[in-house]
UniProtKB/Swiss-Prot annotation:
PANTHER family: RIBOSOME MATURATION FACTOR RIMP. HAMAP family: RimP. The gene is rimP. This is Ribosome maturation factor RimP. The keyword Cytoplasm applies.
């Protein structure tokens, strides 16, 4: 399963009204696993029926393009409570929420912060985050190596 999979998955999902949140490859050579996390473009919750519909469509498309072998596992799911923040649109959508962010610009390199605002566009987006001590820090999104929503048990 090469790098050619992601553009095909992204295109197929867009046609169905979904966005690709995360694509992971795992398993073994004999039985590869392709994990796909999706989100609805209308920002409604992803249902089991959504996952089944996407799975059927992706399976047909991936097999037709000969991008997967005969013995593979395709897992389609919602992004979950600790969804990754990969794009500026993700950051904007979750302003006011807490996220675990890895960046050399944060004390210790990794912190749970509150997303206060996101400014800029075209690859120059900057997130204003509030650290655990209440200090606000500007972090260019290109300087973030990983970010995930932090699960809040109180919600």
């Amino acid at each position: 399963m090469g790098e050619a999979i992601e553009p095909i998955v992204t295109q197929e999902l867009a046609g169905l009204g979904f966005d690709l949140v995360e694509l992971r490859r795992g398993g073994s050579r004999a039985r590869p696993v392709l994990e796909i996390r999706i989100d609805r473009r209308d920002e409604e919750k992803v249902t089991i029926d959504d996952c089944a519909r996407v799975s059927r469509a992706l399976e047909a498309r991936l097999e037709a393009a000969a991008l997967v072998g005969e013995q593979y596992v395709l897992e389609v799911s919602s992004p979950g409570a600790d969804r990754p923040l990969r794009h500026a649109a993700d950051w904007r959508r979750f302003v006011g929420r807490r996220a675990t962010v890895t960046s050399g610009l944060l004390a210790g390199g990794k912190q749970e912060v509150e997303i206060v605002a996101v400014t800029g566009e075209g690859g120059a987006e900057v997130a204003l985050v509030r650290d655990p001590k209440g200090r606000e820090v500007s972090v260019p999104l290109r300087e973030v190596s990983q970010a995930r929503l932090a699960f809040n048990w109180k919600r």
